[in-house]
């Protein structure tokens, strides 16, 4: 009985520790850039019908590019959002990118707002974990 209890407690501790490590895949370093993936970071940030995950690439405290990842948003509208927003933060310092005023895409407001929120999540994460 004591062995089973000890085993269960050990398993619970290991699982708790693993849950704290979940953020390790959020920010990686690639080709001298920090890459922040909002797939798990922004999993609750949804556009019209689905999450809108992104990768934000940062080098020397400056946004290099935004990469739109696969989403279940309506393709017709998500493509419009991607075309309109993909380069809005490029070349800006992280500080300036966080305050950049970006207009939403007409007809794709929810998707646009979700993308903007994911960019802000990525920038905040970068600043607190670099």
PLM region spans:
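Flexible, solvent-exposed loop/hinge segments and secondary-structure transition points
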Residues: 2, 6-7, 21-130
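Bacterial N-terminal signal peptides
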Residues: 8-18
